[in-house]
Amino acid sequence: MLLQGTHRIGRMAMLLALADQNESPVLSIPKGWKYCTGKVGSMNSQKVVAAMETAAKSNQVIETDVYRETHALYHAIMEALYGVTRGQIQLADVLRTVGLRFAIVRGTPYDGKKEGEWVAVALYGTIGAPVKGSEHEAIGLGINHI
């Protein structure tokens, strides 16, 4: 059960999330892996989660009718949000807003087939008061098995 050096799913997700629109991260996505990227901004954490779930489903990163896939994605999203929000998933209640780029990557990072597929969610952007200029950078990463 070795983690393959060329198959670091979290690193791939982070590089995709960090890349600007006009940048293309130098990545070689392994054959059979799936990913999507997008942007989301809100004072409502439920909208942030919903936007990422919708992107993953509409880009066929996860299957819409398989509960364990949605469940794994949800936990990876929440773990990444913990990083962005420093463990406090509240946004609107404490007058905070986020503007984030995200990447969701699905693949097999281990060399053993029995380890199965994993999903990684990376978030990068800003968090702060809902006043332009009153924010700072933040980053989060969540990885979960499917």
UniProtKB/Swiss-Prot annotation:
Under SUPFAM superfamilies, the record lists: Hut operon positive regulatory protein HutP (SSF111064)
GO biological process annotation, one example? positive regulation of gene expression
Specify the superkingdom.
Answer: Bacteria
User: What keywords appear on the UniProt entry?
Assistant: Activator, Histidine metabolism, RNA-binding, Transcription, Transcription regulation
Any GO MF annotation of the entry = mRNA binding
Q: Which Pfam families match?
A: HutP
Whether Protease counts among this entry's keywords is no
**Residues annotated as transmembrane:** none
Q: How does it assemble?
A: Homohexamer.
Q: What does this protein do?
A: Antiterminator that binds to cis-acting regulatory sequences on the mRNA in the presence of histidine, thereby suppressing transcription termination and activating the hut operon for histidine utilization.
Q: Which HAMAP family match?
A: HutP
Q: What's the family?
A: Belongs to the HutP family.
What is this protein identified as? Hut operon positive regulatory protein
List the top taxonomic levels of the source. Answer: Bacteria, Bacillati, Bacillota, Bacilli, Bacillales
What gene makes this protein? hutP
